[in-house]
From Swiss-Prot:
Localization of this protein: Cell membrane
PANTHER family xref list: CADHERIN-87A, PROTOCADHERIN BETA-7
Source organism of this protein record: Homo sapiens (Human)
Protein name: Protocadherin beta-7
One GO MF term: calcium ion binding
Gene behind the chain: PCDHB7
Amino acid sequence: MEARVERAVQKRQVLFLCVFLGMSWAGAEPLRYFVAEETERGTFLTNLAKDLGLGVGELRARGTRIVSDQNMQILLLSSLTGDLLLNEKLDREELCGPREPCVLPFQLLLEKPFQIFRAELWVRDINDHAPVFLDREISLKILESTTPGAAFLLESAQDSDVGTNSLSNYTISPNAYFHINVHDSGEGNIYPELVLNQVLDREEIPEFSLTLTALDGGSPPRSGTALVRILVLDVNDNAPDFVRSLYKVQVPENSPVGSMVVSVSARDLDTGSNGEIAYAFSYATERILKTFQINPTSGSLHLKAQLDYEAIQTYTLTIQAKDGGGLSGKCTVVVDVTDINDNRPELLLSSLTSPIAENSPETVVAVFRIRDRDSGNNGKTVCSIQDDVPFILKPSVENFYTLVTEKPLDRERNTEYNITITVTDLGTPRLKTEHNITVLVSDVNDNAPAFTQTSYTLFVRENNSPALPIGSVSATDRDSGTNAQVIYSLLPSQDPHLPLASLVSINADNGHLFALRSLDYEALQAFEFRVGATDRGSPALSSEALVRVLVLDANDNSPFVLYPLQNSSAPCTEPLPRAAEPGYLVTKVVAVDGDSGQNAWLSYQLLKATEPGLFGVWAHNGEVRTARLLSERDAAKQRLVVLVKDNGEPPRSATATLHVLLVDGFSQPYLRLPEAAPDQANSLTVYLVVALASVSSLFLLSVLLFVAVRLCRRSRAAPVGRCSVPEGPFPRHLVDLSGTGTLSQSYQYEVCLTGGSGTNEFKFLKPIIPNLLPQSTGREVEENRPFQNNLGF
């Protein structure tokens, strides 16, 4: 059963394919191929590739198929060679019956592009059936008074063959009294008449037994025989006579079995048995005998089987009325079968293309044929589909229709369509058939990938581990399949100085971003680049997004002491007057941190000291000040270790070692210029220093003698230590100036200027009152406050 269903589906598909061929060659003459019935299966008929002017490969590539209305597939097309073969042995009598010629139409369907070629298979009859008499014995009663030349109808033989192979002649065994005349019924059938040659004499020959032979026209001819028994009777000179020689009736095809079709009537003027009439069919075919029956007494004709207009539309019957004396008459009954709307329309799907691309307007989705076996309005059909689908029906040739997309489809809105094709005939009552088709929509790359954000901000802590992810980007594509597969990539940087290829990489499959090297906040605080998302469609579509990477500072730099310089060969020694009061500014530790934020917030503390409690360090600015008055017991040389610590986590630190020399007075002021010229922004500060030096020089000339005497008296006094100025990488950060002014030699000033300072401040160290001045009240004048002149320095 499954094999039959599968075979039926294949036949239906073949039929659907033929639709395409008919559309392109509907107006051309059909291709004709001839084959004799009973030809063996597999017989070669023709090469379709040559007939159609196509190559064998093209025939196969275009999906050539055979479509026919037959319920069985009688032809087979070889896709490899293009040969058309006979798929089964044919019986012309079964396929066409008495119809001549026996033509089996079919169509050749080609796709890509769509074409239909009409073709016909003509089945030639062979002489495979011998004539057959339904009754092997025929009885006749003939009056002896019958005039020579009288004719008597005999039962005709049946031959299923047609044309020259059909029944062509009758003969009778040789005798002196009878011969056979052959007559044509006008419908392609012949029947025999027995003709009397001479007067009969019942007393001499009361009965004849003759052999009736029916011959067909085949080569060699076939024959069939029947025995004719003739009984010679006394005189019966009136034959039955029908009231009408021709009866025409119309019978609906849905008439029930047993219903009366028509009643015929004949009269006989004789009496007795010679006037008794019996009705019967004369030379009736087997189909007529299966469909009708006649009452031999009343002459009423009844249905013996159900009529079918779609099979046979007209029956022609010859009815014979025979009396008891053997005389007979005949009439003709023509039965026209009227059509009733008893067949629903049939939808024969030839081709279905599914799935179809979403951007394909005016695309043929399906080809089908509508067939209604009824006639007239009962066979006329109307085909439609629902309104809510983007498809239309287009009629074609020979009741073919194509289902075509009305506009481009959108797979992202509908992935499939369920289409109901409704076919309704115009009969009464109307019959309809519905056929459902599911059309899948295949994806086309019409949507570019879309990032979830137009820009991404990533925070990466410096000193990160290379090859670890630092973030990710994500894009989605509304398409499906490979059209929705997204490939991520880095786009070329718009900054030519940014080595993007050595900084980050991206996973092409998932969009994860990786740092290729450890980032250094001090070298690169932030950078940005663009990433692309490209699908795998054809052509590929893409989109972009901006990625900003902010490098977070880590506490990876220890404080660096700028002053005093720690790696100098000569240690920095700061002089400190023994008369300094508590809070006296000895020096200032200057340090920087390469980090930022709280990692660069520096704090200072005194770690070690020769005399604990003598000095203190301000935590926020690194100023080293005296914590108490100096005494004679304090060592002349003091060593301080200052700890500089940042505010990172964990904190980093550095130490600065200071040497402080306790002195009773100052030596000649000194002026040490920086190795590099100051910036133009500090020119005003330089002018101020020069002016101060000039005034001090004038003052020095007036007290030179006094100073010389005092210096000689203090030959044993310790020289004033000098502080080396940082060199190397920080030539412009600090400028130390020393000089003498117009004041007394007992005063010494040290001016510390920062080359990069924006405040243009300078500081005077407070004057030292030497022990040479006994008249001094011991009061020291402190000028330790920052001084800023009115010109804005």
